[in-house]
Amino acid sequence: MSYTFSRRAFLKYSAATAVAVAGASLLGGCEYQDPNNPVSKKVNSYLDSALQLRAGLRDMKIENGTCTLTVDIRSVRENPFKLYPSCFSVSVIGVDEDAEGKTKTVQRYFSMNEGGVKFLNATSVLVGKKNPKVEGLQMVATNFPDLQDGDTVLFQYIPESTMSDFSLNWEITKEVYDEFIAKQSTSGN
């Protein structure tokens, strides 16, 4: 019995391993998550940033052409940073059919084109060692469209405008939003 591993056997087992790994990722729904730009697909969820902070989209309501968002932010940073409305943006991405019947992705709304996001209960907030958390920061985006089937609301928070390659993102589909609102109405909130 020989304990040598031939080139042919190596290639055979390498190919089998590659197929197994590829198959496992397809079956397991493997999805890459950029650590600098984490994404949540739920309302009332929190994300951690490499910039030593945690932010959460606590609540979201769309009614009468206004999208109202409630956010919580916690920091463990030594140096303080300011929260401005321009740190946040909201957009709606939908699916549309062209003249040939092919579906394409379209941007139906972008808050920066509508005057940006506005804070309801603050103008700007300093977050740092002396004030490490902001809870219940409310903001609105106006001229907001009613959600249609296939729409996704993209809510983005960029903590430092000079470091726009770091962001926290929420991708809320119409179905997830409708489910969130239904749960709120049944729980009496």
Predicted regions and their residues:
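Structural beta-strand segments of beta-rich domains
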Residues: 67-69
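Low-complexity, acidic Ser/Thr/Pro/Gly-rich terminal tails and inter-domain linkers that flank the onset
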Residues: 38-62
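Surface-exposed edge beta-strand/loop patches
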Residues: 38-40, 127-189
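N-terminal secretory signal peptides and thylakoid transit peptides that target proteins
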Residues: 1-18
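Bacterial signal peptide processing site
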Residues: 31-32
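Bacterial N-terminal signal peptides
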Residues: 20-22
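The feature marks short-to-medium sequence segments in extracytoplasmic or secretory-pathway proteins
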Residues: 61-64, 74-135, 167, 180
